[in-house]
Structures are given as structure tokens and as C-alpha cells.
Amino acid sequence: MTKSLLSLAVTAFILGGCSLIPDYQTPEAPVAAQWPQGPAYSPTQSADVAAAEQGWRQFFHDPALQQLIQTSLVNNRDLRVAALNLDAYRAQYRIQRADLFPAVSATGSGSRQRVPANMSQTGESGITSQYSATLGVSAYELDLFGRVRSLTEQALETYLSSEQARRSTQIALVASVANAYYTWQADQALFKLTEETLKTYEESYNLTRRSNEVGVASALDVSQARTAVEGARVKYSQYQRLVAQDVNSLTVLLGTGIPADLAKPLELDADQLAEVPAGLPSDILQRRPDIQEAEHLLKAANANIGAARAAFFPSISLTANAGSLSPDMGHLFAGGQGTWLFQPQINLPIFNAGSLKASLDYSKIQKDINVAKYEKTIQTAFQEVSDGLAARKTFEEQLQAQRDLVQANQDYYRLAERRYRIGIDSNLTFLDAQRNLFSAQQALIGDRLSQLTSEVNLYKALGGGWYEQTGQANQQASVETPKG
């Protein structure tokens, strides 16, 4: 019996090397080898530190924003859910991995039964006792064709994908907090600008109204001045509402209220961000967690094909135990009371109405779907980086042009005001200068906000936002396979 068990174990070990998982090959990236070139793009420059390895504390210069990001990483609910999902998939992997090994259990039992006389072979009533103690394996599947190992591989890749999903969630959170913060700052600047402009309009309106009372200004001039005041009041209410809504958005992202001891923010036009290098398109394949997540899911689908293939072959399960059996507890472990059970079972699929073939087809289709998703993720990443690179140069030029436009409108406003005060030009010219200056100043703040959010999105598109400090990438080890 011992030789038979040994032979079976050796055979299972030899066949255990059999795997029906298809050889995995990473699909070709469906994007160009270089970033787009043209007048809208600046020449790409190399750097010692890739964007994905640049710490967010080095990228964001505003101490208030750094404080908000740190708060969000502690309290944000989406990030908490992503971390819990990671723990859940790790547990699922450990559960599946445990099927590779036999589950050994020890059992002990005892029973006493009274047998009536008419049921006894001796014709007399009596009491029978039975006690047992066994150690054994129950329904352990010998993984001859790799079905269990395929499922374990699938669970591992799913777990690894959840780790990358958590990284993606954090990177997206850092960018979202930054964009929400800059929007809040911009709306505050617009609100302050509108408040100052409204005061100017009201002063002009009161002056025009007094001029009308003495016959210098016409009723039309008064009406035009009032129109400017009411228009500014509309903007005042609008920006007041937006500032309040910006605070609400930030509160959700932070997972708590804005800290009362928030550091003093930088001015919106200050040096807010460090420049990030674009690198090569091939770099994002290794640095974007969403791409790595998609590839892990593709590998998981590939492993499922191995499990579907293995279902066509016989499966062998083994139940075995050894122990002792005695009618007397005191002699349970005495010599001669030994007992054993060896119960192999083989299951050979013969007819299943095509379900196994359909299951294999389904697993192959799922792999093709994941290939398409993987390629789409790469294409989306390429587009996001390309858009960010195009925005970088054009926003610099646009902002400079807008600053020049504001300066020109300030000159126009000063001249128009002077000419209106001394009676050379009408009130219409002066009001037009006021409106043009107000519009140009609003546009400058809006363009600056668009530039900042574009740079933040480029940092995110390049995989930045995972590390707090530059240099941590070399200190942190890659994700380890969890131990069972």
C-alpha cells in the first residue's frame, strides 16, 4: 500500500509540471514610437528623473496644496475603498492558492448505542461503543493538468491588477485635489476682481447720475452706467456661488473639511509647478499604473484559458486517512487498533452538451476583449500626454498674449477715463474701456487656470503622483506576491 501511494505521489509530481496556459506575449503598443511633432509642440527633453518618479511635494510648490494633498491621502473614501479592494483580492488569491496543497485535518469521534433484545444478534439487549481518531486528507485534487494552478495564476494576476488600480486611484486623487484647489484659487481671484470692478462701476454710476442731475450727462449715459453695474452684480453672485461650490468639492476629495491651519497659498500667477519631462512613449508602458493594471487583467484572462482547457481532461481527487478505532476509549491507541482509508476518485467528462467547448470559447473571447482594452488604455495614455505637450507650449504663448492684452486694455481704460472726465469723449467710450478691461482680466485668470490644470493633467498622464518625495522609487520594492 505504501508503494502504491508513493508511486501515485511521484506520478502526480511529474505530471504537475503540465500547464495548459497559453504562452503569454505582450501585445504590440498601437502608438507611435515618438510623441507628435509640430509647431504646437516644444522639443522633448530628457531628464534624470522621470515624471512618474518625481515626488508630488517637488512638483507642487504651493505649501497649502501640499497640505491638502496629504490630508486627502489620509481621509479620501475612494482611496480607502481601493485599499480595501486590494486586501480583498489578496485574500481571494490566498484562498485559491490553498487549493494547491492538501488540507490535512484531524478528527476524533465517539458513540454509545443501546441495542434492544429483538434487534440484537444474541437475543439480549446491550450497549455498544465506538471511538475513533484519524488524521487525513479529504477530496484533494491532484492537479495533473494544471487547472488549479491556472486558477491560482488568474487570482494572482487579479490581485496584482488591484494593486495597480490602487495606484491609479491615488494618482487621480492627487491630480483632482490639485485641479480643485487651483479652481478654488482662480474663482477666489475672479470674485475679488469682480468685487473691485463692481465698486468702480458703482462709483462711475454715481458720478454719472450726479452729472445727469446738473445737466452734464444724459439719461442714456446713466442707463449705460447702470447696465455695467448690474452686469457686474451678476458676475459677483456667480463667483460667490462658485467659490462656495469649490469648497464643497474640495471637502469631498479631502474626505474632511479644509484644515483651519491651512498654510498661506501662493499667488495664482506665482511659480506653482515644476516642469516634468515627457520621456518616450515606451516609458509610459512601465510607469502608468492603469496600463499595468490592464496587462495584469489580460494575463489573468490568459490564465483562465488554461483552466478551461484543463476541464476537458480527467480530474482525480484523493481522500485518505489513517488512525485508530476501538470500542473502548482506554484502548483507542493500543496496538492492533489501527485503521486506514484510501479512496481515490476520477471524473472523466464524456457528454456535457458542449458546455466545456463554450467555456473555452468564452475564455478566449475574454482574452481578446482584454487585449482590446489594453491597447485602448495605451492609446488613451498616448493621447493624454500628447494633449498635455501641445498645451504646454501653446498656453505659454497664449498667456503672454493675454497679459499683453490686459496691459493694452489698462492703457485704453486710463486714456478713456481721462478723456471722459475732461469732456472729450462720451460715457460710451469709457464704459467700453471698463468692460474690455474687466473681460481681459477675467480671461487672464481663466487662461492661467487652464494652464495649471493642463500641467497637472500632464503630470498625471505621465504617471506622476504616486511618490511623495523624489527618489522614493529607488527605495520602494515592487509588489511582492502574498504568501499563503
Curated annotation (Swiss-Prot):
Lipid-substituted positions (S-diacylglycerol cysteine): 18
Any one GO molecular function term: efflux transmembrane transporter activity
Compartments, as annotated in UniProt: Cell outer membrane
One Gene Ontology term from the biological process aspect of the record: response to antibiotic
Transport is among the record's keywords: yes
Pfam hit, one: OEP
NCBIfam families reported for this sequence: outer_NodT
Stated name of the protein: Toluene efflux pump outer membrane protein TtgC
Native organism: Pseudomonas putida (strain DOT-T1E)
